[in-house]
Amino acid sequence: MLAKRIVPCLDVREGKVVKGVQFRNHEIVGDIVPLAARYAEEGADELVFYDITASAHDRVIDKSWVSRVAEQIDIPFCVAGGIKTIEQAREKLAFGADKISINSPALSDPSLISRLQDEFGRQCIVIGIDSFYDAVSDSYKVKQFTGDEAATKDTQWYTQDWVEEVQKRGCGEIVLNVMNQDGVRGGYDIKQLSIVRAICDVPLIASGGAGTMEHFKAVFELAKVDAALAASVFHKGIIDIGELKQYLHANNIAIRL
């Protein structure tokens, strides 16, 4: 059995790590490189960096901090933010990122997924999906440009349909960002993740809702995800990564110690 992964997420805006609640009201958490180094030291399996306003503001991740992170940590990391071309992806990988993630650019140009896969291989192509539960229609819908409240918009896609579409086009991994749960620390959306897991044949990363160690245990056991991403519980020191891994190991979750 492959080991499950614990993945701290660092949302980046204007060169700082920030965190919001349900994709709104972001506050500064700290500097990028020291936080990345801390999480690597604590035992994170991988890191994800989202430049949250890049796509909405039509720019690309700042390459300077990508190279500084690569110099400081020895675990894999993924970067996202405004990557719309092969050349932009190549640059980020050349500066040390192990994977690139695309979200809003893929919604604008789905063929980008297959072009990136053809060029770099699916193993380093991650698709981020910002999924919102619409209680009125009792359905899961994909949102775009969520890093900026003023720019956020609905798309034509229902979450399940988009999950299937990005797999057909060659993605190697999916991060499901459950917007309703983001930052509230009430637990992962097991129901939605289980629905997606049933149609997802590539590694699936749960994102949104982690508040306790039990939440990580539940998402691995019940939703069968491959990795759990979290931000505020790590940024605020609510959960220590090393202690979390010991807890999961003690509860028979396959995890690297």
Swiss-Prot record:
Alphabetic keyword roster: Amino-acid biosynthesis, Cytoplasm, Histidine biosynthesis, Lyase
EC number assigned by the record: 4.3.2.10
GO molecular function, one term: imidazoleglycerol-phosphate synthase activity
One GO CC term, this protein: cytoplasm
Catalyzed reactions per annotation: 5-[(5-phospho-1-deoxy-D-ribulos-1-ylimino)methylamino]-1-(5-phospho-beta-D-ribosyl)imidazole-4-carboxamide + L-glutamine = D-erythro-1-(imidazol-4-yl)glycerol 3-phosphate + 5-amino-1-(5-phospho-beta-D-ribosyl)imidazole-4-carboxamide + L-glutamate + H(+)
Primary localization class, coarse: cytoplasm
Compartments where located: Cytoplasm
UniProt record similarity statement: Belongs to the HisA/HisF family.
Subunit organization: Heterodimer of HisH and HisF.
HAMAP family given in the database record: HisF
Stated name of the protein: Imidazole glycerol phosphate synthase subunit HisF
Organism of origin: Shewanella frigidimarina (strain NCIMB 400)
